[in-house]
Amino acid sequence: MYSLIRKCLFSMDAETAHNFSIQALKLAGKLPINVLPMPLNPVEVMGLQFKNPIGLAAGADKNGEAIDGFGKLGFGFIEVGTVTPVAQDGNPKPRQFRILEAEGIINRNGFNNLGVDVLVENVKKAKYDGIIGINIGKNAVTPIERALDDYQICLRKVYEHADYITVNISSPNTKNLRTLQYGEALDDLLRSLKSEQESLSQKFNRYKPLVLKIAPDLTDEEIASVADGLIRHKIDGVIAGNTTLSRDPVVGLKNAEQQGGLSGKPLNTLSTRLISTLAEELNGTLPIIGSGGIHSVASGQEKIDAGASLLQVYSAMIYQGLALIQNLAKHIQVR
């Protein structure tokens, strides 16, 4: 069945196919039946109860338009965004490219979204009863020196409506964003956002975990530095990781020369290395959410065995269809 759907979707360019899928899932979300059952494989992470350890990665539903539709596919949690303080168009099109032979995707979207206020309204309307994370970023026009302002604006606006909040400082498609992963810039950001989290938890009388999303391109030394910052500032979790700038796994393939972040199956080895190195440095002090390149139960389990407590998928679903979510949710064994 999915082979027919995929043939139809792949006859369109990647972004048109994505937008079509979001509209279809919005419609599915309004139907009174589940498309697929919610597999029960419960796990507790960051003080939150997940019905199963498989989540939708950020970037799939940037504006929270199709939460209920995605929820009917069997995800134990859904992360929406990345969202910015005000709406922005992102980078010029075309900006999404399939690497068919490798089951990969390159994107240079640049945080295209309708703004945090629209996302919050969509989250408020959603009926999905799983865990919802909201992924926040900065506007392209905001100087990197003022990035904290954007993250604070978003954190304040989404806090009441999220189960957890992810701080995205690792997209390669927003100028200088990845510099926030290093040294004093990271220290200042984490310190300020942790303070904001504490204030908001008192205001709303509920603690919402704060998660950092990092790049798979960090060196071992840089991973150790990030881990140290996460521990010192008592950040609640880390997503390992975002898309990669490396083209080593897809060299010579059609579209491999396109600029942007590479996701999908080619990212698998790099993201598992990131999880493994991070797990060594963190030594169990905070949980890791594994993301990047998961395309089978074996590749997902590999990330759990490397140190992840939860998993996120997106690109592989485009190539393989909905059965992948069901298989992962049923068969992944969290240690």
From Swiss-Prot:
Its EC number is 1.3.5.2. CDD domains: DHOD_2_like. It catalyses: (S)-dihydroorotate + a quinone = orotate + a quinol. It comes from the Bacteria. It is found in: Cell membrane. Binds 1 FMN per subunit. InterPro entries: Aldolase_TIM, DHO_dehydrogenase, Dihydroorotate_DH_1_2, Dihydroorotate_DH_2, Dihydroorotate_DH_cat, Dihydroorotate_DH_CS. Pathway: Pyrimidine metabolism; UMP biosynthesis via de novo pathway; orotate from (S)-dihydroorotate (quinone route): step 1/1. GO terms for cellular component: cytoplasm; plasma membrane. Keywords: Cell membrane, Flavoprotein, FMN, Membrane, Oxidoreductase, Pyrimidine biosynthesis. It is a peripheral membrane protein. GO terms for molecular function: dihydroorotate dehydrogenase (quinone) activity. Pfam families: DHO_dh (PF01180). One of its GO terms (biological process) is 'de novo' pyrimidine nucleobase biosynthetic process. FMN binds at residues 58-62, 82, 135, 168, 213, 241, 264, 293, 314-315. Its cofactor is FMN. Substrate binds at residues 62, 107-111, 168, 173, 242-243. NCBIfam families: PRK05286.1-1 (NF003644), PRK05286.1-2 (NF003645), PRK05286.1-4 (NF003646), PRK05286.2-5 (NF003652), pyrD_sub2 (TIGR01036). Monomer. Belongs to the dihydroorotate dehydrogenase family. Type 2 subfamily. Catalyzes the conversion of dihydroorotate to orotate with quinone as electron acceptor. This is Dihydroorotate dehydrogenase (quinone). It comes from Actinobacillus pleuropneumoniae serotype 7 (strain AP76).
